[in-house]
Structures are given as C-alpha cells and as structure tokens.
C-alpha cells in the first residue's frame, strides 16, 4: 500500500512542479519504487511471510504505521502550494529517509553478525541506497522551495513538522517493539535501533533548517 503511494507521489511531482528536470527525476524515482515493491514482495516470499502479510490489519503497530504513512502521502493531493510544500517535506524526511530503515538495519545485522540472509542483505543494501537518494533529492527540493517562498516556513509550518516528526518516531518505535517482542538481540539491542531512528529523524530535520 505504502509503496503504491510512494510511486504515485514521485510520478505526480511534475504536475505540481512543471519543470522538465523535476519531471525526469520524479518518473525515474517512480520506476525505482516499482522495483522496490517487487523486491519487498520477493523478500516476503523468501521469508515465507505472505500469509502473515494478509494479517497486517490485525497487528496494531503495523496497521498504525501504514495508516500514518498513507495519510502523509495523501497530503500531496492538496490544492494549496504551501501545503504541498509541507507534503514534500514530510514525505522526503519521514517516509523516504526514515521509514523502513530500522528494518533494513535489523536484517543486515543478521548478515553481518550471524552470516544469515546474505542475498536479502544485498537487495536491501541496494534498495536503501536508492531510498536515501530519494530522500536527499526531496530535501534539496524543500530547501529550494524555502528560498523561493520563505513566508511559508513560519511558526505554523514548524509546529506541523515537529508534530509529524513525533508521530513518525512513535510509529517507528511501536514497529520496533513489535519486532523485538520475543526478546532482544545481543548483537543489535532494541534501544540501539531506536537511537538509530532518532538520529535519522534529527539529521532529517536539521537538513531542512529545523
């Protein structure tokens, strides 16, 4: 669900920012999100979790996260330019730059410390690099918008961003707690993953002047 929303967001970017260069990047990112969708589907199949995926609505932490991420993507449908700028900011910082990265870290740690999931780790490493690029492009876009329209980035915008950041962390924290519900990992403690997410969130905020 979220990958579909992400693909649509980048594919629609040109309609709100009709610059050929932005359109080219948006369409390229949308295509890569199709590959991400296929890669994640393959991972579910390899892990034998396809049946579990159908039960996602029965897992509060995952349902809440899907609802949160979907809501963030829906903000892009706004007609107001200021609100659209906010949607680009939230989307780039909290979906592309933070969401999924705790899971990337956990799976790759099994390969690093236990020599497990090597094939999956290679796919995730490639995917995470692309997600990072998407987030960085969005951050550059937000900073350009801020230079051109500084009046949009007022106290109300700051409050919206900080509120969204807190919601993002709360959502990620619940997913991490769910992943670790059967116990901690000696090679990657739960608190380390939570601090990793906080670090990415803080870096994301600083990158756009917050």
Where on the chain are the PLM-derived regions?
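Non-heme di-metal
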Residues: 1-210
């Amino acid at each position: 669900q979220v990958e579909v929303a992400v693909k649509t967001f980048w594919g629609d970017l040109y309609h709100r920012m009709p610059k050929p260069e932005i359109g080219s990047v948006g369409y390229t990112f949308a295509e890569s999100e199709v590959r991400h969708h296929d890669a994640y589907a393959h991972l579910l199949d390899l892990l034998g979790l396809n049946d579990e995926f159908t039960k996602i609505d029965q897992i509060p932490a995952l349902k809440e996260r899907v609802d949160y991420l979907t809501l963030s993507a829906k903000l892009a449908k706004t007609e107001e330019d200021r609100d659209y700028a906010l949607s680009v900011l939230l989307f780039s910082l909290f979906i592309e730059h933070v969401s999924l990265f705790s899971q990337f870290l956990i799976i790759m740690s099994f390969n690093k410390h236990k020599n497990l999931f090597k094939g999956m780790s290679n796919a995730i490493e490639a995917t995470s690099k692309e997600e990072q690029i998407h987030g960085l492009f969005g951050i550059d876009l937000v900073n350009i918008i801020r230079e051109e329209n500084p009046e949009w980035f007022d106290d109300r915008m700051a409050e919206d961003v900080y509120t969204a950041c807190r919601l993002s962390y709360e959502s990620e924290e619940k997913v991490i707690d769910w992943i670790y519900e059967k116990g901690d990992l000696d090679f990657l403690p739960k608190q380390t993953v939570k601090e990793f997410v906080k670090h990415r969130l803080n870096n994301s905020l600083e990158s756009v002047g917050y």
